[in-house]
Amino acid sequence: MTELTQGKAWKTLEAHTQALPHMRALFEADTKRFDNMSTSACGLFLDYSKNRANKETMSLLFSVAEDAQLESKIKAMFNGEMINTTEKRAVLHTALRAKPEQEIMLNGVNIVQEVQETQQQMELFVDAVSSGNWKGYTGKKITDIVSIGIGGSFLGPKIVSQALRPYWSKQLNCHFVANVDASSIVEKLKPLNAETTLFIMSSKSFGTQETLTNTLSAKDWFIEQGGSQADVAKHFVAVTSNVEKATEFGIDADNIFPMWDWVGGRYSLWSAIGLPIALLVGMDNFRALLSGANEMDQHFANTPLSENMPVIMGLFSLLYGNFHDAQSHVVLTYDHYLRGLPAYFQQLDMESNGKSVTLDGTEVDHSTGPVIWGGEGTNGQHAYHQLLHQGTALIPADFIMPLQSHNPLGEHHVQLASNCFGQTQALMQGRSYEEALKELAGSKLPADEKSVIAKHKVMQGNKPSNTILMDKLTPTTLGALIALYEHRTFVQGAIWQINSFDQWGVELGKTLGNDVLDRLSAENDATELDCSSNGLINMFRQKKI
């Protein structure tokens, strides 16, 4: 048994959750519930009133956080302590969006200064490309960026660029490549002109298998299209720690942007990994993105637990996973530009908190990270929302929507909002058997058939959700929103006493993948692995079923 689950607050909360009435009753008992259970910070508004909680629940949740010494753990992260214990690293992605005047010391060095120097390097590069001063090997301006990465060096820049589409420069387009499947890069390159294409290779080691394979294929394509090895420097830049390998590839040392070991991949979009974002929206908007995240950092670091937005959201996720057996959490974005966020939050949360031992190696005796999934409203309402309303699993939901649209066309946004708010109400309220039967009162069906149909139309309700609103989707509010989910993820991991900043499952997959790669090109049939793996390898080598 872990210390966490034996704590008084945990055990009291366990008993308390079983006695809470339906949310309908909670709303009837408190006409000011919306006011009492909502908060604002950093341009975001959070309505958490549609959760299975009352004042006592909140008090117990905060007690669980206090028992886990959450506040001291938050300070430890911001102070640069080695909280990534398995890799003996500090966790300082927050330094990437620090204000220039802030001082964050690590090993006697103010790393904010290093970050600022990198941002200045980025700005010079962005200005050169955007102005047309940076030219390809035939003297033409760059029109297309191909960003090659994997994991955090791919998903973060892609999703943020997608979200900030209204702020894109008219001079540039960007294409993102991650999957090692050749079809991905081949289709991306088909319409492009090598003379006007710039490649950004993002890999800390300059050796990540998928990224290096795609980059080598991009280089081959570039030379096949008329470029030369000598021209590579005009068309390839890198974000990496391995300067030697990058220069061997042909990249000019001046066009290599640094990475640091105190930033994990899934937290790296704020660094030079975000170069594609900066190229598309400009450095002013990129800095606004950083500013919004920094504002959320300050809120998280300095606000009491009871008013702290990431803490509140993290505690609710813990509540449902550990006390209501919720195995997944759905993120529903009611904004087309935010359609990629569920996938980004999926990586952030599941790679961080998909762990089964505590910091000291003890096996946990409770659930940890849930499955994060979701999609774009209103599309999901005609698909998986059915399961949310009437399925047997409890699936907490986050609804995210800007109050103003970038495209105020007719009644579109009003209808979007009505669907968003209507879904949260339906999940909370449900429909009783009596209500369903009453709706059928005017039909000519026999009484026994009405009864059966009414049972099919019953929805239990009491399905929890948060609603996050912002005035408008801007670089600043987007930065705050992403940082909110980063810190929400931290809160859960800190209370569970797991390491949210390593990813040994990912590393094992890489190792075994490389081992299989060698066997796929061997002369003899595979016999050394399990019979299933041997069979699959041999079948692939024969290229037929």
Swiss-Prot record:
<dbReference type="GO" id="GO:0006094">
    <property type="term" value="P:gluconeogenesis"/>
</dbReference>
<comment type="pathway">
    <text>Carbohydrate degradation; glycolysis; D-glyceraldehyde 3-phosphate and glycerone phosphate from D-glucose: step 2/4.</text>
</comment>
<comment type="pathway">
    <text>Carbohydrate biosynthesis; gluconeogenesis.</text>
</comment>
<dbReference type="InterPro" id="IPR046348">
    <property type="entry name" value="SIS_dom_sf"/>
</dbReference>
<dbReference type="GO" id="GO:0006096">
    <property type="term" value="P:glycolytic process"/>
</dbReference>
<dbReference type="GO" id="GO:0004347">
    <property type="term" value="F:glucose-6-phosphate isomerase activity"/>
</dbReference>
<dbReference type="InterPro" id="IPR023096">
    <property type="entry name" value="G6P_Isomerase_C"/>
</dbReference>
<keyword id="KW-0312">Gluconeogenesis</keyword>
<keyword id="KW-0324">Glycolysis</keyword>
<keyword id="KW-0413">Isomerase</keyword>
<comment type="function">
    <text>Catalyzes the reversible isomerization of glucose-6-phosphate to fructose-6-phosphate.</text>
</comment>
<dbReference type="GO" id="GO:0097367">
    <property type="term" value="F:carbohydrate derivative binding"/>
</dbReference>
<keyword id="KW-0963">Cytoplasm</keyword>
<dbReference type="GO" id="GO:0005829">
    <property type="term" value="C:cytosol"/>
</dbReference>
<dbReference type="InterPro" id="IPR001672">
    <property type="entry name" value="G6P_Isomerase"/>
</dbReference>
<dbReference type="GO" id="GO:0051156">
    <property type="term" value="P:glucose 6-phosphate metabolic process"/>
</dbReference>
<feature type="active site">
    <location>
        <position position="382"/>
    </location>
</feature>
<dbReference type="GO" id="GO:0048029">
    <property type="term" value="F:monosaccharide binding"/>
</dbReference>
<feature type="active site">
    <location>
        <position position="510"/>
    </location>
</feature>
<protein>
    <recommendedName>
        <fullName>Glucose-6-phosphate isomerase</fullName>
        <ecNumber>5.3.1.9</ecNumber>
    </recommendedName>
</protein>
<comment type="similarity">
    <text>Belongs to the GPI family.</text>
</comment>
<dbReference type="Pfam" id="PF00342">
    <property type="entry name" value="PGI"/>
</dbReference>
<dbReference type="InterPro" id="IPR035476">
    <property type="entry name" value="SIS_PGI_1"/>
</dbReference>
<dbReference type="InterPro" id="IPR018189">
    <property type="entry name" value="Phosphoglucose_isomerase_CS"/>
</dbReference>
<feature type="active site" description="Proton donor">
    <location>
        <position position="351"/>
    </location>
</feature>
<dbReference type="InterPro" id="IPR035482">
    <property type="entry name" value="SIS_PGI_2"/>
</dbReference>
